[in-house]
Amino acid sequence: MQELNTMRKKVFLLSAIAIGLILIGFLLFMGMPVIGMPLFFVGIIVSLVTAGTIGGKFTLLYKEIICREIIQRLFDVEEYIPKKGFDETFVKETHFISNGNRFSSDDYLRGYYKGIAFERSDVHMQNVTSNGKTTTTVTYFQGSWTVFTLPKKITSYMLIREKEFLSGGRPGGIFSNIPYTEKVIFEDIDFNNRFEVYAEDQHDAFYLITPVFMEKIKELEYMEDGRLIIGIKDEKVHVLFDNRSNAMEPSVWREVSGEDFKIVENEMRKIIRVMDILGLIPENEV
């Protein structure tokens, strides 16, 4: 812990210097561009160098000391690779989220809990556009993405997503790698108001999404801030929480403490909670 905090202080100091130079350079640029512009770019360089060197080392050490300890205590771990994530093609071909042109993924975890296999990673999908004068960045998804094997043998494609303004269109079709899907309406009005469901096979949708399963989906929604997305593809169920955060990343603005262990453990226990709510854990193992 002491080694982590010593490194954190160095990152904090360099980050503060970089931010200060950028702000001062920007302000001076209005009246004294000859001085302001160099300061601004020096601040950018300091920021990039910090992130690429000591900042990266601090993050990796944090994950090896804190994240790995929690993960190995809770799960039978086959792989935990902080710098690795889900493949961009894998994510985009699911069509569970809108596809952007900027993608990153890290904290790849593969393992078992009470014999149930899972994979998990943090995913960040954005779309960046520019008109030559201004650049606009829109975040489509930022959060955790976990994959489980579905107990019921559902081979068709299905998407269950919490409704929001401009939540995305219907997945599938001629120009997609997934089949055509139709919107499914259920008798539960409250469920229809809160979620939209698209399925390749409506019979599979009604077979899986029973009144009991609807309540489980609602329970998952209450479990986490942000938007819930559940996708089914190739007999796998994908559970996505778009909460615009990454609980596995350390903060340089506060000391590393026991609170960090709690934050990471809470994040990892969400995997167990999802398994429990969806009934993935065999009854004799609960």
Region roles according to the model:
Residues 9-31:
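Canonical alpha-helical transmembrane segments of integral membrane proteins
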Residues 26-44:
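Hydrophobic alpha-helical transmembrane segments
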Residues 37, 49-50, 176, 250:
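Generic signal for short, ordered secondary-structure residues
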Residues 68, 72-77, 81-286:
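Charged, low-complexity intrinsically disordered regions
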Residues 39-64:
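Transmembrane alpha-helices and immediately adjacent membrane-cytoplasm interface residues
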Residues 1-10:
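Cytosolic juxtamembrane N-terminal segments of multi-pass membrane proteins
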